[in-house]
Amino acid sequence: MNRIGSLYFNTKFVKSKVCNSTYKAFPLIINHHTMASFQIQIISETLIKPSSPTPPSLKQHRFSDYDKTMHHMYIPAAFLYTSHGHGITSTDEVSQLLKNSLSKTLSHYYHFAGRLVGDSHVDCNDMGVKLFEVRVRCPMTEVLKRPNTDAKDLVFPKGLPWSMGEGDILVVAQITYFDCGGIAISTDMSHKIVDVSSIATFMKDWAAMARNSSHQPYPVIVSPTILPMDDIPATAEDDIMKENICQSRRFLFDDSKIVELKAMAANSGVENPTRVEVVTAILHKCAVTASTTALGSFMPNILLLAVNLRSIVSPPLANTSIGNISSCCAISVTHENQMKFPLLVGELRRSKTKLLQNYGKQLKKSELLFLNGTDKAQKLSDGDSFDCFIFTSWCRSPLYEVDFGWGRPVQVYVPSCPIKNTFRLTDTPAQDGIQALVTLEENVMPIFENDEELLAFASLIKDS
């Protein structure tokens, strides 16, 4: 039985009026795996198909060379709203609104409703996006108070976030209704077809369609030849991406502390350091310090920071371009005396400058996506063992602009990831700081979370 199907039992099949396909009406489930026991009622599982068929000329979506390097891993994001808006009196109305608007939106994102065919392409066969509806017998404040304990199991299909893809399905969504009238809308989207910017664009279009059924999305489905790559060197990617026994923690960097970090970097010669650069550097420094303490010796390492290429390439791509349109700026550290905060910020800046210079010219096959990072990883892997620290910034992406008609989300929630040495940076809801979701091996995290240098600039976000 597949992962999703194995979660449920005693099901009855009925017809969905929205998409004329079957969904399941589920019994009540009690969640005993969190600090509190919540009643979780699985209402339905539906396949939402595009409102209009995909034309024959678009029946195959071929992957770019960079897409092919991506794992079929679900990237999760959940949008939490305290109310489902004025003029809507029941969850049935919310359900119909979201299903109909999703169906219309998918007609513009035709490959999202298709099925994966190996690593080569998507069969745009309109089979649909999987949508779950769930009712949780608790107020949304329970999720907001306990992001580290309860949130993931309540707003995502169990076991799905960050997992390897569920067969050939590319997108899974869930609508969670709370007793207080709050609602969470989550998506798990395959990294084979999207990056963070693509997720934000799709969610904004779905939300706009819910507000106005005549909305016309204009996603730019990028040609597979727009970002060419030559042969990719062998790396330790499988070792980097494999799941480990890890612990995750969330840290808050207030704007005032980020200003202090930027001043420290500027005083050491880095011109106009960015908030992401300084937060990345201090997290990297403290993580390597903790790892060195746990291991008993320093290990050479590489830092990879994902960079959105849409505005960088020549000619620039539209912000609404859909696909994996990213690269990595990277720094390699071979000696412990290089692990100084100003040096790390400076190296990040130099790597980013080189990336901008490369992609600011017309793209050539000799200027390869991703290799700015993987060539350094290859050099390290040819020698001794090395660690890899992977940073992704969701900051400044328009995730908090996703408005289905009941206002901005009170929280955009990203669940913890089981892959070690991963760091995800997001804006705070009030846009007054950065939240960092950090995942490290379980013997490293206790050292990291008590690092005095880290805690001078960041506070640990605890469940209340």
From Swiss-Prot:
Top class in the EC scheme: transferase
Keyword Transferase among UniProt keywords: yes
GO cellular component, one term: cytoplasm
One of the Pfam families matching this protein, by short name: Transferase
Pathway listed: Alkaloid biosynthesis
Tissue expression as described in the entry: Mainly expressed in roots.
Cystine crosslinks: none
Subunit structure: Monomer.
Similarity comment text for this entry: Belongs to the plant acyltransferase family.
The name this protein goes by in its record: 17,18-epoxy-17-hydroxycur-19-ene N-malonyltransferase
Gene field: AT
